Amino acid sequence: MALNKAEILDAIAGMTVLELSELIKEMEEKFGVSAAAAAVAVAAPAAGGAAAAAEEQTEFTVVLVEAGANKVSVIKAVRELTGLGLKEAKDLVDGAPKPVKEALPKADAEAAKKKLEEAGAKVEVK
């Protein structure tokens, strides 16, 4: 006979803190998960702005600051990175400083920066 959610919750409610701790450890072992991430997520809102400022940035924006001397190579690099057409890529390069790509993981942002710098552009990752 399977237990329903209400019965499981009632059983958990009747446990002591020590029993709950042991239950969590056994669940972590059985399912190969960690309850630490949930504890951090719950504690973060209570800590307020200090915790938010301490968090590592996960999304980055690649900003074209200046096209440099070799504008044609920069336009080609922008087209490869963004998939834009020739006119759109040229307008983006001419309108610098402008974001080229947004919400990228750090590795992708660094790769895009490297590609644009190799083409002769000045680039920032924010």
UniProtKB/Swiss-Prot annotation:
Print the keywords alphabetically: Ribonucleoprotein, Ribosomal protein
- Homology family: Belongs to the bacterial ribosomal protein bL12 family.
Q: What does this protein do?
A: Forms part of the ribosomal stalk which helps the ribosome interact with GTP-bound translation factors. Is thus essential for accurate translation.
Quaternary structure, per UniProt, is: Homodimer. Part of the ribosomal stalk of the 50S ribosomal subunit. Forms a multimeric L10(L12)X complex, where L10 forms an elongated spine to which 2 to 4 L12 dimers bind in a sequential fashion. Binds GTP-bound translation factors.
What gene is this protein a product of?
Answer: rplL
Top-level lineage group: Bacteria
Name under which the protein is recorded = Large ribosomal subunit protein bL12
- HAMAP family, sorted: Ribosomal_bL12 (MF_00368)
Does the keyword field hold Oxidoreductase?
no
- What biological-process GO terms show up in the record? translation
Q: Pfam families annotated for this entry?
A: Ribosomal_L12 (PF00542), Ribosomal_L12_N (PF16320)
GO CC terms of this entry: cytosolic large ribosomal subunit
* Single GO molecular function: structural constituent of ribosome
